[in-house]
């Protein structure tokens, strides 16, 4: 994601570069913000009978947002508050921006605190990890997962039904050839930055004939192998970036040294005001439910150089964080 911050005008100019960037834009755009950009809408000049689709530069005051992870789309709705000179009859009418990868938009935040918090979110997005197509395979099944900074999404299963009869070697090759074909189909669809093969070492030796990618030997393949890949220290950098490691440390401190942990908005806000936060974990849905309160916390954490992790609600960590009040922090002292 490319972005530029104009602090004097409280404006962020952003060009999303891939679908994951749309998620971070969804988080930092609030109701009441002004979003500007090039768009196409129906325009009927005075004195004409029929309208036509015209490209124009508009600004809308945000009333609603709609983000679809699986479609990779972000829509922003609201009344038009700014329009380029020479375009009449559009201001005040409602419009929907489709924010897509490769198209720049401007976001004008309502106050300085929200702008500073938005910078923290953008810094997190800038350090986003490669998108990984994980192929977890053993001699019984293969599971395919899409691993990004947004979490782990299991895409597809393939069972080795041919194991029921026939020659073992040829049947395994038949199954692995099907794994290779499925991998290529998913590679074309999702365009990952890399493919990672995970599973028992002896199986990986065979899989490599059909699928090209980084090999990660582990004890299990299939769906169990997906969870093993995420839980074990096989991809520590990835785990750290999306908050797994911070959440594990938070749970450990809750059990052994609870004074080093703050949970819930009130306690976390107090810790943020005192500059005590080392790592902040915030539920994505909690941001949309309480934007002013959460942006204030994120802004203070960002100023004190805290690590910030935004956690999706539809993950294992998200369920635990929701039970803690939607926000939690590991404290420096």
Swiss-Prot record:
Pfam families: eRF1_1, eRF1_3. One of its GO terms (molecular function) is metal ion binding. Its cofactor is a divalent metal cation. The keyword Isomerase does not apply. GO terms for biological process: nonfunctional rRNA decay; nuclear-transcribed mRNA catabolic process, no-go decay; nuclear-transcribed mRNA catabolic process, non-stop decay; ribosome disassembly; RNA surveillance. Disulfide bonds: none annotated. GO terms for cellular component: cytoplasm. Coiled coil: none annotated. It is found in: Cytoplasm. It comes from the Archaea. Keywords: Cytoplasm, Endonuclease, Hydrolase, Metal-binding, Nuclease. Its EC number is 3.1.-.-. Its main location: cytoplasm. InterPro entries: eFR1_2_sf, eRF1_1_Pelota, eRF1_3, Pelota/DOM34_N, Pelota_arc, Ribosomal_eL30-like_sf, Transl-rel_pelota. Monomer. May function in recognizing stalled ribosomes, interact with stem-loop structures in stalled mRNA molecules, and effect endonucleolytic cleavage of the mRNA. May play a role in the release non-functional ribosomes and degradation of damaged mRNAs. Has endoribonuclease activity. The N-terminal domain has the RNA-binding Sm fold. It harbors the endoribonuclease activity. Belongs to the eukaryotic release factor 1 family. Pelota subfamily. This is Protein pelota homolog. It comes from Pyrobaculum arsenaticum (strain DSM 13514 / JCM 11321 / PZ6). The gene is pelA.
């Amino acid at each position: 994601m490319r972005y530029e911050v104009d602090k004097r005008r409280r404006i962020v100019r952003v060009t999303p570069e891939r679908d994951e960037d749309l998620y971070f834009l969804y988080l930092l755009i609030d109701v009441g913000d002004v979003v500007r950009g090039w768009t196409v809408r129906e325009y009927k000049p005075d004195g004409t009978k029929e309208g036509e689709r015209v490209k124009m530069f508009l600004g809308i005051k945000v009333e609603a947002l709609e983000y679809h992870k699986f479609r990779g789309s972000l829509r922003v709705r609201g009344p038009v508050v700014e329009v380029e000179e020479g375009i009449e009859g559009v201001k005040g009418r409602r419009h929907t921006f489709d924010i897509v990868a490769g198209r720049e938009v401007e976001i004008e935040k309502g106050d300085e605190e929200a702008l500073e918090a938005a910078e923290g979110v953008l810094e997190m997005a800038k350090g986003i990890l490669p998108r990984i197509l994980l192929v977890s395979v053993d001699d019984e099944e293969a599971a395919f997962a899409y691993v990004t900074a947004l979490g782990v999404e299991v895409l597809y299963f393939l069972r080795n039904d041919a194991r029921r009869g026939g020659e073992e070697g040829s049947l395994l090759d038949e199954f692995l050839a099907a794994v290779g074909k499925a991998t290529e189909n998913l590679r074309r669809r999702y365009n990952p930055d890399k493919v990672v093969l995970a599973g028992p070492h002896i199986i990986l030796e065979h899989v490599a004939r059909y699928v090209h990618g980084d090999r990660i030997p582990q004890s299990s393949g299939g769906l169990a192998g997906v969870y093993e890949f995420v839980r074990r220290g096989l991809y520590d950098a990835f785990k750290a970036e999306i908050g797994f490691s911070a959440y594990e440390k938070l749970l450990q401190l809750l059990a052994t040294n609870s004074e080093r942990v703050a949970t819930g908005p009130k306690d976390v806000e107090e810790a943020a005001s005192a500059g005590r936060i080392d790592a902040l974990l915030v539920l994505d849905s909690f941001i949309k439910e309480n934007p002013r309160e959460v942006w204030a916390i994120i802004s203070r954490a960002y100023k004190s150089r805290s690590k910030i992790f935004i956690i999706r609600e539809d993950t294992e960590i998200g369920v635990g964080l929701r039970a803690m009040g939607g926000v939690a922090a590991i404290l420096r002292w």
